[in-house]
Amino acid sequence: MYRIRVFGDPVLRKRAKPVTKFDENLKKTIERMIETMYHYDGVGLAAPQVGISQRFFVMDVGNGPVAVINPEILEIDPETEVAEEGCLSFPEIFVEIERSKRIKVKYQNTRGEYVEEELEGYAARVFQHEFDHLNGVLIIDRISPAKRLLLRKKLMDIARTVKR
């Protein structure tokens, strides 16, 4: 199992590098990430959240775990919806985030094969949330400055726990 990196850890702000090796190490890392995600009752977990600055994440929106490697969002539906999101890197913080209802995506699986699919609703939301992590974008970047100010004390408390 991995330790979850929390707000204040610099790895969360880096743009992750593409995965180039589809080997046993990657598969083992993904298995550990899935175990970690389930342990913390998450529905998604991006590599930067466990200190790995590479472009992949795992998610499970009810159909079993999926590994998403080198993802791209090909199309974003202009229709959006607002819903509450939490994040394992922001313990006990939940915020309303506006995201596209439907997206078309392309990514690689653990064998390096390309997968293209359309996601909507909850699956689209989780994909967009984890995709943000690969670009160093966090949920607090998607809320208003006023809401961020209201969370300032909680955020500072979380940042104080970061192991330097």
UniProtKB/Swiss-Prot annotation:
Enzyme Commission number(s): 3.5.1.88
UniProt-listed GO biological process terms: co-translational protein modification; translation
Ligand binding (Fe cation): 87, 129, 133
Root EC class: hydrolase
Keyword annotations of the record: Hydrolase, Iron, Metal-binding, Protein biosynthesis
Known catalytic reactions: N-terminal N-formyl-L-methionyl-[peptide] + H2O = N-terminal L-methionyl-[peptide] + formate
Cofactor: Fe(2+)
Active site feature: 130
Family classification: Belongs to the polypeptide deformylase family.
Protein name (record): Peptide deformylase
Species this chain originates from: Thermotoga maritima (strain ATCC 43589 / DSM 3109 / JCM 10099 / NBRC 100826 / MSB8)
Classification of source organism: Bacteria, Thermotogati, Thermotogota, Thermotogae, Thermotogales
Gene designation: def
